[in-house]
Regions:
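A short, surface-exposed interaction/processing loop segment used at functional sites
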Residues: 17-19
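Catalytic glycan-binding domains that act on GlcNAc-containing polysaccharides
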Residues: 9, 21-22, 26-178
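N-terminal propeptides/low-complexity segments immediately following signal peptides
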Residues: 1-15
């Protein structure tokens, strides 16, 4: 109700609606917005992010932008459709990439970065298609031969790219084809 609306505007939370495809609505006024209680986590996972990004030939800033958008740095985040943890892994994706504890930051980030590397290879290093696949599933990117016409996915790609470029030193030349 009204209290929730006031809370979300005051706290600048990212809300994940209960739909089959995540809806990303940032109630904050800027790209840096994160729920206040999790803003302390913004740099808490930097070592894990750097290690996983390096292992999979990714830019750590990109991984951080995805975590920012997916979970707002909340390691216990859970979406309505069932995605969990910092990189919001769905159960099937977690199993596919050998993640046994989605709430363990190292496992979650490790699985999420493996998945992102897989998507980048699959979509010929096209970052926007890889992000769309991360959000809506690679099958939807194949089906629509590009970013799916889902407002949620289009917003997700835009938001991650914006955060990557504005907040986390985005540099697509750091994405290798490893």
């Amino acid at each position: 109700g009204d209290d929730f609306g006031r809370y979300t505007k005051l706290e600048k939370v990212t809300w994940f609606d209960d739909t089959n495809v995540h809806k990303y609505k940032n109630w904050g006024k800027d790209e840096f917005a994160v729920k206040q209680s999790f803003s302390k986590n913004r740099d808490a996972y930097d070592d894990i992010i750097a290690q996983a990004a390096s292992m999979h030939g990714l830019d750590k800033g990109l991984v951080k932008a995805i975590i920012h958008t997916e979970s707002g740095f909340n390691p216990r985040a859970r979406s309505g459709p069932g995605a969990k943890g910092l990189m919001q892994l769905m159960p099937a994706t977690a199993r596919r990439f050998a993640v046994t504890d989605v709430y363990d930051p190292a496992q979650n980030i490790g699985g999420g970065t493996k998945y992102l590397r897989f998507l980048l290879k699959r979509f010929n290093n096209d970052l926007e298609l890889a992000l769309a696949g991360y959000n809506a599933g690679e099958g939807n990117v194949d089906k629509y031969k590009g970013i799916p016409p889902f407002a949620e996915t289009q917003d997700y790609v835009r938001r991650v790219m914006s955060r990557y470029n504005k907040l986390y030193g985005g540099n697509t030349s750091r994405l290798s084809m490893n």
